[in-house]
């Protein structure tokens, strides 16, 4: 059959074009067999302006950080100096086995003013009598030692179970004394519930984070007895509404950066609710017009966070995103690759930048009863 095509092709220039295209398709198919989609990492041919920013326009308070190895505190301070970061809040002050005391002691030995620590309640004790009251007492003791806030990890409402085998909801009344105590002490609750929307949808050809979920199957919370993302967020919102005197900071843009319209509605509804941008510039930067309008409108309610160990190179990606109008920025160095897209800078006004970088955080942190 190939011989017939070649003979026929000699008689007609138009058919020579057809043969070339047919050969190209066949060649492409052969090459494609050697490249998996997960291995495909195309390099853009765009030539666009790149602004190099190593220092922010205003000093930074990173209110969402994880300091990791405590012996690296000196290195972290060096990275902070290099990146113009004045204060970092570590969210790793776990109350289990009183680990927060070690974290506090180490942090304060290097810099009491620059390395702050939040307290993470021990949900494993949920079945103990008077758990909430007792944990609230431990929190007050921790605040007297220097703890400046509370951190809620995503396991609450998602994987933590009590002795009945049921998942403990975020708005479980047993936890009310903890939220109330935060209000009394005037310390914030950094609350992370649920995860990206894609992690709660089927892992199929329509999932925009398929490659991540294929590499990390445990990141998927679709089905298998997990509550829906919507239900978890509703639980959190009921807590915020019930405890109006307590400040809640919604980690990762309130855990719904894919829908800033809804996040804006929450901010309108709950005056005690704030959000931070940590590890979500990949979501914000693919909707730059909407994100810019959001940041300007809610400039008094947005905080800066990175969600990583202090790293000057990672901070520079955040600064470039917030301060410039650069196009097609690779967000991966700011945290890790989240989705197969690049982002666009928001070029925020200086008065907005200063609030996001430090002023909003200062108001919250400086309100604490114990400092």
Whereabouts are the PLM-identified features?
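Acidic-and-aromatic substrate-binding clefts and catalytic sites of carbohydrate-active enzymes
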Residues: 65-74, 92-100, 124-133, 160, ...
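Bacterial N-terminal signal peptides
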Residues: 18-29
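Alpha-helical scaffolding within the catalytic cores
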Residues: 45-48, 71-76, 97-107, 133-138, ...
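An N-terminally biased module of ancient metal coordination in phosphate/nucleic-acid-related enzymes
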Residues: 33-113
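H/E-rich (His + Asp/Glu) clusters that bind or coordinate divalent metals
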Residues: 224-225, 229-371
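Hydrophobic faces of well-ordered beta-strands that scaffold small-molecule active sites
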Residues: 61-65, 87-90, 115-120, 150-152, ...
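N-terminal secretory signal peptides that target proteins for export/translocation
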Residues: 1-14
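Active-site gating/metal-coordination segments in enzymes
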Residues: 34, 51-53, 101-220, 271
